């Protein structure tokens, strides 16, 4: 992790609009009517409804998705008691995390009050505004009483994240580390160094999970907390040990199975780690300097199972894995509280997630090939997109089962879809593709079975149930790669096209291809040679019905692949060209871009084919095409160069297909801005319509356009390139394609294959 300088931190917070969060309107406000509805007089109606039924605040206001992050600044991170206002950047940061990880809106509230009673009164007074309250950076022991009282006296979820966030994540880590070590929680000896809010809450949750009080030793700055001491508060007395033979950490740690550190750096020595039981679990969570460094712990004994609070080492105990999703589940059930059942549900959901196959987006983020459950990975990574569904659902179910939910979630699949859409992890179009493919999975050939991304994509597509994968490549090489990536090849067919066992099939394919291209100078001998190439062999599998779709491109230049596709598969009747399309899923909507791959310098005839194919393809995806044919000029303003080709294509399409919403040539800003276009060019056939399909004048502009959009907003989902115009489902990837890109194209290929089969059956 790069070193953060003071100058960089201050610049980050001050540049542009100061701070890190803002309020954004969620309703229209551009007209006087909008404003009259938003405020007076229209706003009176929801006010009266809420007066009659306070629960309607969840229906008519933002309360149900609004959390207060409240602090008095008495224990700010590692800075201590710096005051309420000084802690505001931290509270804004917490609000940012709520928003980006769970879509929850936040008001940060800094209360300049250290007296617990007055602080409680202030929070209670503003509580009606919020659906939940996250207490933050309040010092112990006052934080215990403040949280207890607010939980008792308010009917919305209240959680002090410094206590329970760390407790939940470390508990999930402990559950999994114990599984790796082959130990049971009720049997292990636990040493806790630190007795602040986090340490106390962690240890209490361990007890809820089955740890025995008599097996726990807790230490504070004065040493072991024993029943012989007279200086203990209520929280410390709960964990006081009967043992009188130990007084220091060095004495307490001997033979221990688990060390939990929430204290200060460098207090646990290598000798202490060596004195622990076999496969010791060390959670050194002091930040930024752990109780023992990862390097020192691992060099002391290689069997240690270690977690820290740092992102640059394995198994980070990071509260962001928990609090956004715990509040998400609580808010979505309008829960009255966050109780022990909900916290334990979160623990098990987080723990179970670490045991599941890791999405490629996570591997990519951490620059590894394949994370898998074990000593270096027993806690999920914060970027794991499954946390929003796994943890939120578990918490919501626990809220309902434990009786604190005011509303029920009845369709859990729909709820998960809602959560993924909320975070932009899934668009409606993508979900429809996958759902359709699952209902009728087809045989899909993956050309480059030895490429890690294609192998992962085939395995993921199989797991998603969208296809029956066939991998082309050497069995042993693919098996070895799968073993390295910890992937199961169960249910996946491997075809070694160069193996002698495939000689009969190569000969059969050669005869068919030679006969098909006989009048084009293509001999049987040439065809036989080509069958040792993956693209020829794979496409012939589709051509002969041995497979239903083919995906290629990670190792092959497009120009070569296009040539093979034309020779083996051919172009659909009625067309002289084929092309490709990219689909862009953005917050503004779904857009279709063509031709993004095939035709470098299309003439008018080619542009006509691209437009006709785009029309068919957009309808294939259940959208009504509104097509803009792009150029650098508008509607005949330039009568030379490329605009003339586009203008000619538009004239043809409007004449031959008068029902089609298509116009041009036009600049992209006029295509994308309906009001601007209608005002300047009221005669256009697209008047009053929002364009969703963009036809580019050449490959340079198309390629630059979609890649510019990708670079400017990496969160925008692109699906493609989607082939348009070949006789059968041959689809392309490129060397930049991620696993998710390939799986998305696989879903498209499957649906393409289904449509082709239906057409053939109807003939």
Can you describe what each PLM-predicted range is?
Residues 2-3, 161-162, 181-183, 284-392, ...:
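Adenosine-phosphate binding glycine-rich loop
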Residues 66-78, 83, 167-170, 181-207:
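Glycine-rich adenosine-cofactor-binding loop
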Residues 193, 209-236:
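NAD(P)-binding Rossmann-fold cofactor-contacting core
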């Amino acid at each position: 992790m790069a070193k953060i300088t003071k100058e960089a931190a201050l610049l980050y917070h001050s540049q542009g609009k100061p701070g890190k969060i803002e309020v954004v309107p969620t309703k229209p406000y551009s007209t006087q009517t909008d404003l009259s509805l938003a405020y007076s007089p229209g706003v009176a109606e929801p006010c009266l409804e809420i007066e009659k039924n306070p629960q309607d605040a969840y229906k008519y206001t933002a309360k149900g998705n609004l959390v207060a992050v409240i602090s008095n600044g008495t224990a700010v991170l590692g800075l201590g008691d710096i005051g309420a206002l000084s802690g505001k950047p931290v509270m804004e940061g917490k609000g940012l995390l709520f928003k980006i990880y769970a879509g929850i809106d936040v008001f940060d509230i800094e209360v300049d009050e250290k007296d617990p009673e007055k602080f409680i009164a202030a929070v209670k007074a503003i509580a009606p505004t919020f659906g939940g309250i996250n207490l933050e950076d309040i010092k112990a022991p006052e934080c215990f009483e403040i949280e207890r009282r607010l939980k008792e006296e308010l009917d919305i979820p209240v959680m002090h994240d410094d206590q329970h966030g760390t407790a939940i994540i470390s508990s999930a880590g402990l559950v999994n580390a114990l599984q790796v070590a082959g130990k049971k929680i009720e049997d292990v000896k636990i040493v806790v160094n630190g007795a602040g809010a986090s340490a106390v809450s962690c240890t209490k949750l361990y007890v809820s999970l089955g740890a025995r009080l008599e097996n726990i030793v807790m230490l504070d700055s004065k040493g072991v907390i024993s029943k012989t001491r007279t200086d203990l508060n209520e929280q410390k007395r709960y964990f006081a040990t009967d043992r009188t033979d130990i007084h220091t950490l060095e004495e307490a740690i001997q033979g221990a199975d688990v060390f939990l550190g929430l204290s200060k750096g460098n207090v646990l020595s290598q000798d202490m780690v060596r004195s622990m039981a076999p496969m010791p679990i060390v959670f050194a969570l002091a930040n930024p300097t752990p109780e023992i460094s990862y390097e020192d712990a691992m060099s002391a004994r290689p069997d240690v199972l270690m977690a820290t609070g740092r992102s640059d080492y394995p198994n980070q105990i990071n509260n962001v894995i928990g609090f956004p999703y715990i509040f998400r589940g609580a808010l979505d059930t309008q829960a009255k509280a966050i109780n022990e059942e909900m916290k334990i549900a979160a623990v098990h959901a987080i723990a179970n997630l670490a045991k599941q196959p890791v999405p490629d987006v996570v591997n990519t983020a951490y620059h590894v090939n394949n994370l898998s459950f074990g000593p270096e990975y027993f806690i999920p990574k914060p970027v794991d997109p499954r946390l929003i569904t796994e943890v939120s659902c578990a918490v919501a179910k626990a809220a309902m089962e434990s009786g604190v939910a005011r509303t029920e979630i009845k369709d859990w699949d729909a709820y998960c879809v809602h959560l993924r859409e909320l975070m932009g992890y899934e668009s409606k179009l993508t979900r429809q593709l996958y759902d359709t493919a699952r209902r009728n999975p087809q045989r899909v050939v993956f050309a480059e079975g030895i490429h890690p991304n294609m192998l992962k994509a085939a395995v993921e597509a199989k797991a998603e149930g969208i296809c029956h994968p066939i991998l082309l490549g050497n069995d042993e090489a693919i098996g070895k790669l799968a073993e390295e990536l910890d992937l199961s090849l169960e249910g996946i067919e491997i075809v070694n096209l160069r193996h002698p066992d495939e000689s009969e099939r190569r000969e059969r394919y050669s005869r068919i291809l030679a006969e098909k291209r006989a009048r084009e100078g293509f001999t049987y001998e040439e065809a036989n040679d080509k069958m040792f190439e993956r693209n020829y062999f794979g496409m012939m599998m589709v051509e002969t019905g041995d497979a239903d779709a083919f995906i290629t491109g990670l190792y092959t230049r497009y120009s070569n692949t296009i040539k093979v596709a034309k020779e083996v598969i051919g172009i659909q009747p009625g067309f002289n060209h084929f092309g490709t399309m990219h689909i862009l899923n953005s917050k503004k909507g779904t857009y279709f871009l063509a031709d993004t791959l095939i035709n470098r310098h299309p003439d008018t005839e080619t542009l006509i084919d691209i437009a006709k194919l785009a029309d068919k393809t957009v309808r294939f995806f259940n959208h009504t095409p509104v097509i803009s044919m792009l150029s650098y000029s508008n509607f005949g303003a330039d009568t030379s160069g490329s605009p003339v080709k586009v203008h000619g294509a538009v004239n043809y399409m409007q004449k031959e297909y008068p029902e089609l919403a298509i116009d041009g040539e036009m600049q992209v800003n006029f295509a994308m801005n309906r009001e601007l276009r209608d005002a300047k060019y009221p005669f256009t056939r697209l008047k009053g319509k929002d364009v969703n399909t963009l036809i580019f004048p050449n490959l340079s502009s198309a390629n630059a356009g979609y890649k510019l959009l990708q670079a400017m907003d990496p969160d925008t989902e692109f699906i493609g390139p989607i082939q348009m115009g070949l006789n059968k489902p041959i689809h392309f990837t490129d060397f930049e394609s991620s696993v998710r890109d390939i799986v998305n194209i696989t879903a498209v290929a499957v649906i393409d294959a289904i449509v082709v089969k239906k057409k053939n059956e109807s003939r």
